[in-house]
Amino acid sequence: MPNKTAMIKRNSDKRLTRAQVRVFQKNIYAYYDAHGRDLPWRRTRDPYRVIVSEIMLQQTQVERVIEKYTAFIKLFPDFLALSKAPLKKLLTVWQGLGYNRRALALKALAQKVIDGHGGKLPSDPAMLLALPGIGKYTAGAVAAFAFNKPVVFMDTNIRRVYIQAFFHDRADIHDDEIIPFLEQTMDVENPRKWYNALMDYGAMLKREQVNPNRRSAHYTKQSPFENSNRQVRGRILKILVKEAPLTQARIVKKTGMDPERIKKNLVQLVEEGFIKKKGRSFAL
């Protein structure tokens, strides 16, 4: 449980004293040293493995990623292997993670690293941002976890920690208000450990308290998966991985879903490069 006596009241000018920073860091590290998670991507400094884990973790629970990550790394151990991966093989190992666009983006990223960076992932967050599938958070996370750079970035767990610590009497809190606290409390000597500790502390807060993120101006609930287009697309791809080519009528029959929704999603999957249409049939 968090040490409530160590929670710091927010200064009106957003400036913290050195003592306040020390208390905050001590509280976070105390929890991490006792309860930090042993995750496979935390046992490596390989930038390739770090970026694979970060893309897998986008909008996906840690528990679901662990098994898939290990299998993925065995099949595609580096950027070169991933860049040459057949789409069918890639989507087969990706099944169960959802958001299949990430798999295509990761393959495209691997090709960019091979072609534009000599097979080595850049450490500069600005250069990382230029790669497929990489947003501001992922660029910062990769810079910190792979290269131990003291860059400022935020995810849902980190946001939760800072809202709970510094904004306990507030609602409708914007990330721009949180950033100054992130900057002041950064452990610049070991940002890798610091961010791991923040994330584990934030995950604990979600389990043991009313979620502080509900007071964030950016808080939204994830849309239900059941009967969503994500579910439709996932079923189509799962079928085509196992059996192809298939006509639209056969896909409708195998999924048992609405023909119009199948038609719409087939068109989108073709446009996005997931599948190909030849005549009346579809395949990877």
Q: Across the structure, where does each feature detected by a protein language model lie?
A:
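A short, conserved structural fragment
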Residues: V270-F282
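Short, hydrophobic-biased segments on the C-terminal half of alpha helices
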Residues: L266-V267
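Hydrophobic residues on short alpha-helical segments
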Residues: R233-L240
